[in-house]
Each structure stands twice: as C-alpha cells, then as structure tokens.
Amino acid sequence: MDFRTEFKPLTVQPQQIEGKSFEMITEELGPHPFTDEQYPIVQRVIHRSADFELGRSMLFHPDAIQAGIKAIRSGKQVVADVQMVQVGTNKQRIEKHGGEIKVYISDSDVMEEAKRLNTTRAIISMRKAIKEADGGIFAIGNAPTALLELIRLIKEGEAKPGLVIGLPVGFVSAAESKEELAKLYVPFITNIGRKGGSTVTVAALNAISILADSGVTYEGSAKRT
C-alpha cells in the first residue's frame, strides 16, 4: 500500500465538522430527559468526551442554566480548580461581560497554607476563592477534595456561588462528592459516577458562556424528545 497517495485530508471547515458532530450526537443519543436549556450543555460534554454514558449521567439543578447565564452576564468571576480548566475556557466570552476566570491552586500563599495545615492545595484554594468570587461560577473538574470543601463552605454559609459545575473525575471521592453536590439548594451542574474531568468541565462552562453571549433567554423548561 502506498501511504503517500492513500490518505486524503478533509477539506471541510471546522464549523461544518462541529455541526455534523452535533447532528450525529443528537441522532445517537435519541430520546432523553433533558430540557431545551440543558441539552446544549449535554451535547457539548458528549462532543468533547465522545462518551454517551457520561452525557446521559448529567444532572442539573432546575435553575442551573439561568443562574450560569446570569452570573456571566453580570460579570461575576469564574473560579477554576486547576489551570487546565482555565486554559481551556473561552476567556473572551467571559471577559466581554466584565468577568474573568481565576485559579488559585498555584498561588504562593495557598501552597504555604496547605503545607502549614498539612492539607491539600485544592482545599485551601477554595477557601481563598470564596472570598473573591461571591455569586460567581465555580468550575471543578479535577479535584474531588476541592468540591467537597466548597460543599462544606456552602453548607456552613461561608460560600454563596451563583453556579457550581462539579465534574471531577477519579476513584477516590469523585462520585461521592457529586452525590453531595446534587443534594444542595444552590444551582449546580454535575453527573453521576466516577467519570468527568477538566475537559468536560470546560465543555460545560463554554456551553454556558455561549448561551450567555448569544442573548438567549429561557422562560420554561420544555423537555426535548
């Protein structure tokens, strides 16, 4: 086989590839329980992960999408648990409305305090973040300990986020942290089980920012079929 002539690169535009991917996702996913406002987030999570099981496991607080849109349009801060989430997020759409996306886990004072208390930087980063991001979006895709600490701070009345996107991946405390998040009164986006990660957290956050940037409004929660 002559590999020099066998391979022919695609010549379609990126938008065409994405559009075709979304069509395939909708067709393969079939009937689902998600509302019109929730579905774009699920669609982008599946698009990023190629994992329909993960997409079907998504859970939403009834006010999650509207809360996320409101936070972005109001210029609230977005807090990421790790740099990967920060780097992957479309900052232009966040900054357009006066917000910014910040990550605290590598701050020198966070590292020093974590060492002093013999705990994780993820935990200390959440304690710092809540002082600067009242009403903001917390996007956690890597560290279950960060999500568990944020949940504790919410329960104790120390944190009042506008939206929590909690999709950490892993075997230790990942599923459990998401179960606890789903019990809270604050708006959240999460999923059932161990799957998740920074890339799907970015997908969910970017989907929210696209909706916020588009000017879309939701007055109901009509179910898609």
UniProtKB/Swiss-Prot annotation:
EC number: 5.4.99.60
Gene3D superfamilies: Cobalamin biosynthesis CobH/CbiC, precorrin-8X methylmutase
Pathway: Cofactor biosynthesis; adenosylcobalamin biosynthesis; cob(II)yrinate a,c-diamide from sirohydrochlorin (anaerobic route): step 9/10
Annotated catalysed reactions: Co-precorrin-8X = cob(II)yrinate
Binding site for substrate: 21, 44
Short name of one Pfam family: CbiC
SUPFAM superfamilies the record matches: Precorrin-8X methylmutase CbiC/CobH
Disulphide-bonded residues: none
UniProt keyword annotation of Nucleus present: no
InterPro entries (alphabetical): Cbl_synth_CobH/CbiC, CobH/CbiC_sf
Residue numbers annotated as active site: 47 (proton donor/acceptor)
Record function comment: Catalyzes the conversion of cobalt-precorrin-8 to cobyrinate.
Similarity comment: Belongs to the CobH/CbiC family.
Listed name of the protein: Cobalt-precorrin-8 methylmutase
Lineage of the organism: Bacteria, Bacillati, Bacillota, Bacilli, Bacillales
